[in-house]
Amino acid sequence: MIGPDGAADRLTDIMTEYLRDGASIYRRSFAIIRAESDLSAFAPDVAGVVVRMIHACGQTDLTRDVVATEGVVRAARNALTDGAPILCDATMVASGITRRRLPADNEIRCHLHDPAVPELAERMGTTRTAAALELWKPVLDGAVVAIGNAPTALFALLEMIDAGAPRPAAIVGAPVGFVGAAESCAELAARADLEFITVTGRRGGSAITAAAINALASPEE
């Protein structure tokens, strides 16, 4: 149906002229994000990570909720360049990491589906996602951590560190949800002894977390 304002003609023009080149789409997307977002609170290297996070969720007001330490980008990139593993709480986070951006063909680990995890979770009285972190301990020292699904995993990580577990080089902590997400991110944001980037409040998720890791892995947009 063609309306009096020529809406159908405009739709045809859009369908004919839409961008098809992937690189051009990325460049235009990042330009729009930078034009519409207030990134003034962030150092340039952190701002680059935040742009990627916004690109993953489509919400430019995410800048109001992102909290990051001054040295998180440097710490994460140094660790990844040295070959540190990336430890993920969920397979969706792991799947979202772009391997070609990794500087040292870094190992990506997610132990959620390890056969030992259900028994661990039952014994510990916690979620499987949190219990799976027990299997991180041998490689946690100097690793890059990506938690984008379960608040219980972020709480468990902070408890492990407080109990003397090795410290990761950097943490991306952005679990999503209505129960525990805001609280766990607030706990991380209050830590002066860790390098991190987090999203306060209920927002977060696997896509945002993986996008942050991809940005930390390489400065290339």
For each of these PLM feature ranges, what is it?
Residues 22-30, 42-46, 50, 69, ...:
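Generic structural signal for well-ordered, non-membrane alpha-helical segments
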Residues 27-34, 51-54, 74-77, 94, ...:
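Predominant activation on well-ordered alpha-helical scaffold segments within soluble catalytic domains
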Residues 179-221:
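C-terminal functional extensions of proteins
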Residues 90-161, 169, 175-177, 185:
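Conserved mixed alpha/beta catalytic, RNA-binding, or beta-rich assembly cores of soluble enzyme
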Residues 172-174, 198-199:
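Thr-Gly-centered strand-to-loop micro-motif
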Residues 13-83:
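N-terminal nucleotide/polyanion-binding subdomain common to many enzyme families
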